């Protein structure tokens, strides 16, 4: 029973971590989508600057778009991976929860007959 309780807590923590990570990735996805939309509106010969630390570095329009698209691809893949991990953990969580309920039912004293 103790082992099941530990596993239950670990899975609960794992699921919370996945949910937090998914929220962060969704925010990054939204931000990068907005950046890409803004880059689409800008003329190809416009000056684009990328902040690297405290410095602004000039970047070509095409290079900026390519970098943002690459980031978006990566973020989408990470979201898919985490969603899959979350699903697997939720299934395991349900199994452990069921096992705990069964163990508690087996350990409970029988009801006296009326």
Swiss-Prot record:
Keyword Transmembrane: no
GO terms, molecular function: protein-folding chaperone binding; unfolded protein binding
Any single Gene Ontology cellular-component annotation: nucleus
CDD domains: Prefoldin_6 (cd23161)
Domain of life of the organism encoding this protein: Eukaryota
Entries under Pfam families matching the protein: Prefoldin_2 (PF01920)
GO terms for biological process, alphabetical: chaperone-mediated protein complex assembly; protein folding; tubulin complex assembly
Keyword entries, A-Z: Chaperone
Protein family membership: Belongs to the prefoldin subunit beta family.
Quaternary data: Heterohexamer of two PFD-alpha type and four PFD-beta type subunits.
Role, per record: Binds specifically to cytosolic chaperonin (c-CPN) and transfers target proteins to it. Binds to nascent polypeptide chain and promotes folding in an environment in which there are many competing pathways for nonnative proteins.
Protein name: Probable prefoldin subunit 6
């Amino acid at each position: 029973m103790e082992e099941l309780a530990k596993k239950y807590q670990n899975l609960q923590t794992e699921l919370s971590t996945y949910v937090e990570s998914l929220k962060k990735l969704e925010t990054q996805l939204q931000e990068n989508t907005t950046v890409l939309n803004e880059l689409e509106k800008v003329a190809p010969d416009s000056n684009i600057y990328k902040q690297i630390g405290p410095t602004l570095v000039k970047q070509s329009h095409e290079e900026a778009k390519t970098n943002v698209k690459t980031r978006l691809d990566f973020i989408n893949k990470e979201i898919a991976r985490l969603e899959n991990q979350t699903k697997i953990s939720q299934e395991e969580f349900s199994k452990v929860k069921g096992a705990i309920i069964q163990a508690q039912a087996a350990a409970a004293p029988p009801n006296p007959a009326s």
